[in-house]
């Protein structure tokens, strides 16, 4: 395939093609989980999106490009980021898409490309390079195995890798967690607190949780602090939907939040059934999975410990609280979100659960010439 036309996404047809393309590519793939259409539409207002067509007018590729100015200032770089990249198994299509990103980035004064990355660290990041036979989730990117091969053929190299682990939920809390949790409770005066929706949305706990996340994640690769308006949106759209039994915070004696663990029952099969559409009936699948008949896996969405308290049993306190709840609700497996491969301190917290690395994803980079 040679005659590839890349357009900036502007018309209603182009928007719809951008949304529907991955569903067509992965129509017969049982591991792919779609994004919600409404989330994609909203995101298109914040990025420069491109759609690729073949010589008969069929959509064959897509990508979004954007510049995170705060990240560039923080990390001392001039990078254009890309995300939401999908394409058929054709080198010319991949090249046309990335040429468009590189050209647009150059026009904006950037000197390198990085991605797939989100606008914030809580967005989906990293191209899958291992684990193509594992079910995806609401918090991660899925792509076919030919993606990294074609991207690397274009001269892109590894900037960072994230790994994801899966653990079988034990019937009883591991002794290591119990022992360390006891120390945190009795010596440091730390305590578990469960929240109501009102406390999260109206009582300020939502903002306090994201303040902790911003503080704990600040040193991590590519991270930029989430602004207040985005915190408000995430709190209202997502955190309020979480079963509050699956959300734990740890407070010190001054009632300051020093740790948080936001988890949620997997929505993967519900999203597959809905095909990413809330209407007319897609919302029934999602609400049903959240409220009534959940899947057997719990997603560990966001885990953070205040830097001053890291290594003092905060994580153990959270798991001591959550493991019995997971068992009570019938969950069998826990799957962590992407974690940087060199973040050994964070990865070591799973050791008592005999973790298995099941996925690896990569951020690529390339200089713009």
Question: What is the meaning of each model-derived region?
Answer:
Residues 1-32:
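Generic start-of-chain signal for non-secretory N-termini
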Residues 2-4, 141-222:
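Acyltransferase donor/substrate-recognition loop-hinge adjacent to the catalytic core
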Residues 22-55, 63-73, 200-303:
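A conserved beta-strand-loop-helix scaffold within acyl/acetyltransferase catalytic domains
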Residues 55, 66-70, 85-87, 118-120, ...:
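An acidic- and aromatic-residue-enriched active-site/binding cleft used to recognize and process polar
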Residues 74-155, 160, 274-352:
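Acyl-donor binding region in acyl/amide transferases
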Residues 167-170, 365-369:
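Short beta-strand-to-coil "C-cap" segments at the C-terminal boundary of structured domains/repeats
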